[in-house]
Amino acid sequence: MKWGFRWYGEGDSIPLQNVRQIPGINGVIGTLLNKLPGDIWELAEIEELKQSIEKEELTLLGIESVAIHDAIKAGTEERDHYIDHYIQTIKNLSACGIHLICYSFKPIFGWAKTNLFYENEDGSFSLLYDQAVVEGMEPSEMYTLIHSQSKGFKLPGWEEERLKKFNQLMETYDGVTEEVLFDNLAYFLKRIIPVCEEMNVKMAIHPDDPPWEIFGLPRITKNLSDLKKYCLLLTLLTMD
């Protein structure tokens, strides 16, 4: 097993010089914060990220994440266009020597927290999710809450360019049940798995965070039963 520290690029408040001093760290898990779901990650951008890490004598172990466009997750008529973009990104990452991609298949909210700077009893800070807070708000208020705590930092999965169309996104998922969402995941994986095998790229799915439905949006990696179903799907797809 290799240990990687997540790093958000040159704008990260934790410089790579500090990351390098963490005992046992083999490298970093990086991202390109300027990329929106559906964008192609270009070779030059990936190489620039990789070189910025390697010049600090660290290794870019993988990417978290290459976000999946909502058209793919909701199964709209545009999904094949964005899957083609995703496939090109897989090829470009592989060409740069990056063979691990983390991803999630959650509608709209890639992750959800109600407090980004919760102070613990020992004075340390952590993320916090409080279901009672969520139950008392409208879905659109979740973005406002996260944005107000971000201190100007661009958060993956909470891109202003995407979430300012929040009501439109909610309509996109109208009628998308857990079964439909899972079928759309299967469609996506069926298209990318042959490319991943050819490019020697491993895909690592992130479980639901939190591990239950929020705002009526379906979740399909929320418990052991879901993950067993997911693993069975992978087995069937790789047998073809």
Language model features: what each stretch is:
Residues 50-61, 94-162:
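Glycine-rich, aromatic-flanked loop segments that form ligand/cofactor-binding clefts
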Residues 3-7, 26-30, 60-64, 101-103, ...:
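Hydrophobic faces of well-ordered beta-strands that scaffold small-molecule active sites
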Residues 135-141, 145-240:
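Acidic/histidine-rich catalytic cores of soluble enzymes
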Residues 32-47, 109:
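Glycine-rich, proline-tolerant flexible connector loops at the mouths of alpha/beta enzymes
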Residues 39-45, 75-92, 181-188:
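Glycine-rich anion/phosphate-binding loops
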